[in-house]
Amino acid sequence: MALTQERKNEIINEFKTHENDTGSPEVQVAILTEQINTLNEHLRTHKKDHHSRRGLLKMVGQRRNLLTYLRNKDVTRYRNLVDKLGLRR
């Protein structure tokens, strides 16, 4: 259910803004999106797993806050990220 370190490194390399970037909003949103998608698949088969559902809702809220921050800070970076991830915003 959790991301492997290799997959996380792939995401970081794809979305990083500079060489040692691991914590920019783009990277954080991309990692959260991957975790959310994985958890969604888990919850499709395990409908009564309410503990994981709560974790999913917390991740979605955190991603929403990061996207709002990025939209307020730099709209072009926000739009590029949303297009690249295929989010509905």
UniProtKB/Swiss-Prot annotation:
Q: Which SUPFAM superfamilies match?
A: S15/NS1 RNA-binding domain (SSF47060)
| UniProt keyword Lipoprotein present | no
Organism domain of life: Bacteria
Tell me, what is one Gene Ontology molecular-function annotation carried by this entry?
A: rRNA binding
List, alphabetically, the CDD domains matched. Answer: Ribosomal_S15p_S13e
Which BP terms from GO are recorded? translation
Q: Please provide an example of a Pfam family that matches this protein in its UniProt record.
A: Ribosomal_S15
- GO annotation, cellular component aspect: cytosolic small ribosomal subunit
Keyword Ribonucleoprotein tagged: yes
Q: Which UniProt keywords apply?
A: Ribonucleoprotein, Ribosomal protein, RNA-binding, rRNA-binding
Subunit structure and binding partners: Part of the 30S ribosomal subunit. Forms a bridge to the 50S subunit in the 70S ribosome, contacting the 23S rRNA.
Q: Which family does it belong to?
A: Belongs to the universal ribosomal protein uS15 family.
Q: What does this protein do?
A: One of the primary rRNA binding proteins, it binds directly to 16S rRNA where it helps nucleate assembly of the platform of the 30S subunit by binding and bridging several RNA helices of the 16S rRNA. Forms an intersubunit bridge (bridge B4) with the 23S rRNA of the 50S subunit in the ribosome.
Name the HAMAP family on file: Ribosomal_uS15_B (MF_01343_B)
Please give the name of this protein.
Small ribosomal subunit protein uS15
Q: Which organism is it from?
A: Halalkalibacterium halodurans (strain ATCC BAA-125 / DSM 18197 / FERM 7344 / JCM 9153 / C-125)
Give the source lineage, highest ranks first: Bacteria, Bacillati, Bacillota, Bacilli, Bacillales
Which gene is this protein's source? rpsO
